[in-house]
């Protein structure tokens, strides 16, 4: 019998970002209790030698599994040191991979406070709007006009430490152009 390969999408992430993600998950599971239903599996709980950790997030009947890997093939850049993350949605025997934005939306649907359906009406009538949205990462694109109006009216609290975001975990911070402020342009470089 020949070998069968299974391909998975693994987002390349640097080690420090994975460590930050793990500590945020553990904090909100054990201290703040906002993610108390989540399950954290250490590397020694897995049979796979490349798995660093797994976070199982129940979403109703389904489970979102965020797996971190180590010892992977290094990337084309020096800082791609063989660390990665995969995001999988499981329900019974069905499994599929999801992107980080969708993962954050799925997490936000089941966990962390957001504006209630009656928040717009309450805001128009001048009543106190409660609860406020705690998980900004769950709204990955420009929201509805009502959501934008509510966020302008009720500023979200800055949480210390922040809630764990999958999109923030896999964000590519290496290939973004550097933003420099307060520096004048080099006239010799611009040809002026």
Curated annotation (Swiss-Prot):
Residues 40-44 are annotated as: Interaction with host APOBEC3G. Disulfide bonds: none annotated. The modification Phosphothreonine is found at residues 96, 188. Residues 182-192 have a biased composition (Basic and acidic residues). Zn(2+) binds at residues 108, 114, 133, 139. Residues 54-72 are annotated as: Interaction with host APOBEC3F and APOBEC3G. The keyword Cytoplasm does not apply. Its main location: host cell. The modification Phosphoserine is found at residues 144, 165. Residues 171-172 are annotated as: Membrane association. The keyword Thylakoid does not apply. Keywords: AIDS, Host cell membrane, Host cytoplasm, Host membrane, Host-virus interaction, Membrane, Metal-binding, Phosphoprotein, RNA-binding, Ubl conjugation, Ubl conjugation pathway, Virion, Zinc. Residues 151-164 are annotated as: Multimerization. Induction: Expressed late during infection in a Rev-dependent manner. Belongs to the primate lentivirus group Vif protein family. Counteracts the innate antiviral activity of host APOBEC3F and APOBEC3G by promoting their ubiquitination and degradation. Acts as a substrate recognition component of an E3 ubiquitin-protein ligase complex: mechanistically, Vif hijacks a host cullin-5-RING E3 ubiquitin-protein ligase complex (ECS complex) and the transcription coactivator CBFB/CBF-beta to form an active E3 ubiquitin-protein ligase complex that targets APOBEC3G and APOBEC3F for polyubiquitination, leading to their degradation by the proteasome. The BC-like-box motif mediates the interaction with elongin BC complex. The HCCH motif (H-x(5)-C-x(18)-C-x(5)-H) mediates the interaction with CUL5. Homomultimer; in vitro and presumably in vivo. Interacts with viral RNA and Pr55Gag precursor; these interactions mediate Vif incorporation into the virion. Interacts with the viral reverse transcriptase. Forms cullin-5-RING E3 ubiquitin-protein ligase complex (ECS complex) by interacting with host CUL5, RBX2, elongin BC complex (ELOB and ELOC) and CBFB/CBF-beta. Within the ECS complex, Vif interacts directly with host CUL5, ELOC and APOBEC (APOBEC3F and APOBEC3G) substrates. HAMAP family: HIV_VIF. This is Virion infectivity factor. It comes from Human immunodeficiency virus type 1 group M subtype J (isolate SE9280) (HIV-1).
């Amino acid at each position: 019998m020949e070998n069968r390969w299974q391909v998975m999408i693994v987002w390349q992430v640097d080690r420090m970002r994975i460590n930050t993600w793990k500590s945020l998950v553990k904090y909100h599971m054990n201290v703040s209790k906002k993610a108390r239903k989540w399950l954290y599996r250490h590397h020694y709980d897995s049979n796979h030698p490349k798995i660093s950790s797994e976070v199982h997030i129940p979403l109703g009947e389904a489970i979102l599994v965020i797996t971190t890997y180590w010892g992977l093939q290094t990337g084309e850049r020096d800082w791609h040191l063989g660390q990665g993350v995969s995001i999988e949605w499981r329900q019974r025997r069905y499994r599929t991979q999801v992107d980080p934005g969708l993962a954050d939306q799925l997490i936000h649907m089941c966990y962390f406070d957001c504006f209630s359906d009656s928040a717009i009406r309450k805001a128009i009538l001048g009543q106190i709007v409660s609860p406020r949205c705690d998980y900004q990462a769950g709204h990955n694109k420009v929201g509805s006009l009502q959501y934008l109006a509510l966020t302008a009216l009720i500023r979200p609290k800055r949480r210390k430490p922040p809630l764990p975001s999958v999109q923030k975990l896999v964000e590519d911070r290496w290939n973004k152009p550097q933003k420099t402020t307060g520096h004048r342009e080099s006239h010799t470089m611009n040809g002026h």
